[in-house]
Curated annotation (Swiss-Prot):
Residues 34-112 form the Carrier domain. Residues 410-435 are annotated as: Disordered. Keywords: Oxidoreductase, Phosphopantetheine, Phosphoprotein, Transferase. This is Polyketide synthase-related protein Dhc1. It comes from Alternaria cinerariae. It comes from the Eukaryota. Residues 424-435 have a biased composition (Basic and acidic residues). The lineage of its organism: Eukaryota, Fungi, Dikarya, Ascomycota, Pezizomycotina. Pfam families: NAD_binding_4, PP-binding. The gene is Dhc1. Residues 411-422 have a biased composition (Low complexity).
Length: 477
């Protein structure tokens, strides 16, 4: 620090120091316009999640974790976030030795690349098959006595929801609570440090601490029995990762979590509503496919684009689950009363959801925001297909309606079966042999209109002349 001739701190000289230089030194950023790779950007999001508020400081490849406010405790929190997000285990020693964003990115993802080189090709038939424990449970339930009917009352619907603290899940939770027919929402697999974001003042919310990485999602045996007896519909909105993750790192949170939810649904054939991804349909090579099964279009066996692959695997697993239940129930000599109806499953592939509250990491919402700020539209010369946007509120309202209606239908059907103790008449037996027999419905939730890229660009530019923010966020695209 500058000093006076008397050896004291020179306050005037200190005040004249450029704050920008000091900020750059503290941040470890040598060049304000340093470009980041996609991997560095991915890790930066995790830094921003665990570090204290950075203010106007910008993280760059040369930023040092500890110079940006990090410490040993936050480094351990970052280590956990890396494991949960990417599935990569990295020691705190290696993270200490690679404290800049660029060095840490190489440390984490070079390790993953070496592991990927030794990985065997993925067998999708094995990945989407039913685990032996699940097959045993189905076989036992097919001939067992009916379970307790604690959840069959007529005083409202109880919903099991995963992903309640995510962008989509939080809006869906709010929508479910606004329905007068919803009695209670069981929020499962909520990380302990995110429970404060839930509406704790609402007594209809029951929170279960846990994570999708846990084989039981953190649910205790007693909590499991309660959920098996009470919930009427399971809405699986939770997921980890994105297209940069490999399937191996997302198998547990995105696919095996469905295995556990299936064990909860089976005793009373509780409806499962699975929120998949619109990217799954791209595996077919068709940019505007009909809402149908994608079983015939498996992902690549190298595990790349793991998020899409995990969602595809989840869809096909549910198809196999429903088919297996139907086969076992039809072959049982004296099936349980609850197994005389199909296990109902709905798969929803929602479009891009537009909301002013979307996180900065949401790429499409970020493009819309910057387009509004700059009053420019992106040039999409090589793009093909359609853009499907819709307001978040519109889509979650539709999902809520589907969830409540499916739960109500199952409640009424099972109440009637309890009274009559006779198999219900199947009026839809002549329907589609694939979709009807498996009790599976695939729904692609799209915006009101889908337009080709070129047409959409003209409409976009024209309507932005008026009130672009109102048009984008309230009316959908």
């Amino acid at each position: 620090m500058p000093k006076t001739p008397n050896g004291k701190l020179d306050r005037k000289s200190i005040a004249a120091l450029l704050l920008r230089n000091a900020k750059r030194d503290m941040n470890g950023v040598v060049n304000d316009v340093e470009k980041m790779t996609v991997r560095e950007g991915e890790l930066r999001l995790l830094w921003e999640r665990v570090l204290p508020t950075l203010g106007d400081l910008r993280l760059g490849p040369s930023s040092d974790f500890f110079m940006c406010g990090g410490n040993s405790m936050l480094l351990m929190k970052l280590q956990k976030a890396i494991k949960e997000t990417t599935g990569i285990r990295v020691s705190t020693k290696d993270l200490y030795e690679s404290s800049t964003l660029r060095a840490m990115t190489h440390c984490v993802f070079d390790r993953a690349n070496r592991a990927d080189d030794d990985a065997a090709p993925i067998d999708w038939a094995v990945e989407t098959s039913l685990p032996a424990s699940l097959q045993t449970q189905i076989q036992d339930l097919a001939t067992s006595s009916p379970p307790e009917a604690g959840g069959h009352g007529t005083n409202g619907t109880e919903v099991l929801l995963t992903g309640a603290t995510s962008f989509l899940g939080s809006h869906l939770l709010r929508s479910l609570l606004s329905s007068p027919r919803v009695k209670k929402v069981h929020c499962v697999a909520v990380p302990a440090d995110e429970q404060a974001t839930l509406f704790s003042h609402d007594t209809r919310i029951v929170c279960y601490s846990g994570t999708l990485l846990s084989p039981t999602l953190g649910v205790t045996p007693q909590e499991r029995r309660t959920l098996e007896q009470s919930v009427h519909v399971i809405v699986h909105a939770g997921a980890h990762g994105h297209c940069l993750n490999r399937f191996d790192s997302l198998r547990a949170p995105n696919l095996q979590s469905l295995h556990f939810l299936a064990t909860l649904a089976l005793p009373r054939c509780v409806t499962i509503l699975f929120l998949s991804s619109s990217r799954v349909v791209l595996l077919s090579g068709d940019t505007a496919p009909a809402p149908a099964s994608m079983r015939s279009y498996p992902p690549a066996v190298d595990g790349k684009d793991g998020y899409t692959a995990s969602k595809w695997a989840g869809e096909v697993f549910l198809e196999n689950l429903v088919a297996h239940v139907e086969n076992v129930a039809s072959s049982a000599s004296s099936p349980s009363v609850f197994w005389r109806s199909s296990l109902n499953v709905e798969v929803h592939r929602a479009c891009t959801l537009v909301s002013e509250s979307a996180p900065n990491s949401d790429a499409m919402n970020a493009i819309l925001r910057h387009s509004l700020d700059m009053r420019c539209a992106p040039r999409l010369e090589r793009a093909e297909g359609y853009l499907d946007f819709a307001p978040m509120e519109s889509i979650v309202a539709k999902i809520t309606v589907h969830a409540v209606e499916m739960a109500t239908a199952v409640q009424q059907q099972q109440q009637q079966q309890q009274r009559q103790s006779q198999p219900p008449r199947d009026d839809a037996a002549d329907g589609s042999p694939t979709e009807r027999a498996r009790g599976l419905r695939i729904a692609i939730t799209l915006a009101v209109s889908s337009r080709p890229w070129a047409t959409l660009g003209r409409i976009w530019r024209g309507r932005m002349v008026g009130d672009p923010k109102n048009w984008i966020y309230k009316s959908g695209l």
